[in-house]
Amino acid sequence: TDVGSVKSGIVKAARQTLFEKFCNFVPGHPIAGTEKNGVEASLEDLFVNHRVILTPVEETCPKACKLITQMWKAAGADVVNLDVQHHDEVLAATSHLPHMLAYALVDCLAGMQERDEIFKYAAGGFADFTRIASSNPEMWHDICFSNRQALIRTLEIFSTHINKIKVAIEKSESNELLETFRRAKEARDKFNKEKNR
């Protein structure tokens, strides 16, 4: 198995290098971690109550899939299966896009003339939102290019949406702005409720 954030490239490489043993390879992605990396950042309970996505393909041996599922469950994880392409599309939205937003926001503000004051007066919300901008730049550089197509589609959708907010503010479209915020709050509250079940 593996722990990569993008599955399509890993599956392609494994198919080209493992040959007849490819059937024993079970692509996996634990949805757990922090912005820290390296051995010194290891956590013994990292996978407890976190989801691990397996993306078995047509050639994947059921016995290998069962073994890897048992391994992750023994580490305390909740194991689910997804199609390779669907995994990459979902993760582009839920993981890769948020990292791009955090990196872009911090880089943008750090380039402003008032940056010292901006960071001096930044509070908890800013810290929460930008924590992942402290993630490993090289790793995220590679993730961007590994999941390029899905990430570009997601960035385009987000760009359209953020532009609608900009236009609503410019044109004083109070109801449009308030409805956007209400929909977002409702979706976030639902996410929290389901996550804490």
What are these regions (language model features)?
Residues 41-46, 141-142:
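Short, flexible, solvent-exposed loop/turn segments with mixed acidic/basic and small polar residues
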Residues 7, 35, 60-61, 151:
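Alpha-helix N-cap/loop-to-helix initiation residues
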Residues 180-197:
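Rossmann-like nucleotide/phosphate-binding core characteristic of flavoprotein oxidoreductases
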Residues 1-40:
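Rossmann-like NAD(P)(H) cofactor-binding subdomain of soluble oxidoreductases
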Residues 44-131:
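Internal alpha-helical scaffold of NAD(P)-dependent oxidoreductase catalytic cores
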Residues 11-12, 37, 62-66, 155:
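Conserved strand-to-helix beginnings and helix N-cap segments that scaffold or border functional pockets
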Residues 115-184:
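Interdomain hinge/lid region at the active-site interface
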